[in-house]
Amino acid sequence: KKVRIGIVGAGRIGNVHAQSITYHIPEAEVVCVTDVYEPAAKKLAETYGIPKYGADFHMIIDDPTIDAVLVCSPTPTHADIAMAAMKAGKDVFCEKPVDLTIEKIKATEQVAKETGRKLQIGFNRRFDHNHGRVQQLAKSGKLGNIEIVKITSRDPEPPSPEYAASSGGLYIDMMIHDFDMAMF
């Protein structure tokens, strides 16, 4: 049986995940996509052959045939959607950051513990082959005693001022990957 996935958020990252699942993960299928801007959800559904789409994420949360939810919506909505999904019995992959406050992050973690649902945060670079190789070399001691780490990241284009303001800015939304790589 394939894992049936709903994607909340049909922007750039939602598109990346829909494409990856559709073309590279035969054990899973995206069966619904939602976005507050319904035309974006419709376009994503049409592009990847996703059978259902809409504007309200509850159509994913309330669907008993959906096993897991990918939260790819704007940062201020991550925690609430993730908690609702887990309370509805669904496993969750949530883009980072979970929230802009420690309190909501801890509340989301607590819901995962209470419900027994899986909660994975989108630290995707942990699974990148090149990062993995560097990590192996560092842990093996072949790189010696590491005292300084210099990381350079590149996105296709800078975020809009509106996005940077609502997502926590460069440190919380983008450099979080660099901090994760340095600590991982």
What function would you assign to each model-found segment?
Residues K1-Y48:
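N-terminal Rossmann-like dinucleotide-binding module
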Residues H17, Y48-V111:
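Beta-loop-alpha module in the N-terminal Rossmann-like domain of NAD(P)-dependent dehydrogenases
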Residues A28-C32, D67-V69, G169:
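Short active-site oxyanion
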Residues C32, K52, A68, K118, ...:
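Short, Asp-centered acidic motifs that coordinate Mg2+ and/or phosphate
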Residues A41, I81, T108, V134, ...:
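Aromatic/hydrophobic pocket-lining residues that form π-stacking "cages" and hydrophobic walls in ligand
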Residues A107-N124, G144-K150:
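Rossmann-fold dehydrogenase core element
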Residues R125-F184:
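Predominantly a Rossmann-like dinucleotide-binding segment in NAD(P)-dependent oxidoreductases
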